[in-house]
């Protein structure tokens, strides 16, 4: 979910079975994303939602479904979201991953340099290759930190970040995550 907005991803080079990303993480609308799956795996999977346009035939006791990906697309699609996601992808491609990756590196290095000057901060990924820095502040619950940042109009994320096994490995219930993107500046990091 985090890689696609920040770097080129080729599912064939990765030879991944599945890859997912959210539209909102790459300047697109919320409520839409992409799920790539190898065709043979998608063929083996059963749909979990049912509705119009995904059915080939229906009998009283059984149904047959269209070929993937259509068998997973029920009812009316989120047309506006799809148009918005397409525009976001075009925008990212226009800006270019070379610029995005250079900006991520510049901002990440600066953020890490400045955070290391502050006593009481534990950085869990000091050698990150992305613009995402995960940390905690001694004596401050991550959700309390998030509340204070929010009151100062600084958007960060606190919680287990959909990675509870990692939190157990870190022996933490939650962490704070700060992310940069190509539109951020050093001034944003100074404010953070």
What would you call each of these model-derived segments?
Residues 1-192:
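Pyridoxal 5′-phosphate
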